[in-house]
Amino acid sequence: MDYKELYSNYNKRLPFTQLRKWYDKDKDGTKVRELAELQIDIFKSGVSIMVGRDLKNGRTVKENWSNVYGQIDTMYSIFALCKQFIQNTTQTETMKIPIVKVARDDNGKALGDSTLVNAHVIIGRNEKEFYFGVIQPQKGGVHFLLHPPMPGKQWLVAKKDETVDSLTLSKIFATNYFDRILRELDVVKDELTAIYNKAYPRKVKEESKEPEKVDNGDDLDTGLEDII
């Protein structure tokens, strides 16, 4: 097995990270129902956030999809910041986290320490829910509500037959969402470490197996023979 190739092209789907959003779109003066999706996956040892819009009948249209890619350690920290925001925020607010890339010249050479903002990860809270999304320059963004699906009366409190507070429910769902992502990334890092060590083992110089000859004086001419 070529572990170097396996390490460079390591991929893993994370299906539980998918978020969906139905929205109304104006088309020729008529409102039509459209679908947006967000999906987080591991791609070539990094983290990919795919966002698709107008997917109801356009899932296979390339222009409907955008992708944000970041190194696994960077994205791990971003998701940890999102979780911390959810746990600590006490008011309606938004946090914008930039994902940067190295700035390069026309020949592909890095321009010192200069960086460019590739996209922003958005985590926020309104009066009822937490939301999460990605904004890319010149492409806009989509906010996905962090809220479990609620068919029928699934989330009614039996005691008073009243609905559960939507903000509390959203906070629990959002915390669990980022917890699962962080746990999965921990597994990915362990797997990548194992593959990396097989692909690039540390080379240790082997010592000679032939024992050193120890001079114990047996071959010395001591002159004792003449005395004896």
What is the meaning of each model-derived region?
Residues 1-65:
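N-terminal "first-domain core" detector
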Residues 2-10, 67-96, 167-198:
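DNA replication sliding-clamp ring fold and its partner-interaction surfaces
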Residues 31, 48, 55-61, 107-109, ...:
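Short, surface-exposed beta-strand/loop "edge" segments at domain boundaries and coil↔beta transitions
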Residues 51-71, 150-167:
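A cross-kingdom feature marking solvent-exposed beta-strand/loop segments within repeated
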Residues 60-67, 116-120, 141-143:
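Short, mixed charged/polar active-site loops
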Residues 73, 87, 97-103, 222-228:
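Low-complexity, repetitive regions of proteins mediating host interaction that are extracellular
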Residues 93-134, 140:
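Intrinsic, low-complexity N-terminal interaction/targeting segments
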Residues 141-228:
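Mixed-charge, glycine-accented linear interaction segment located at domain edges/termini
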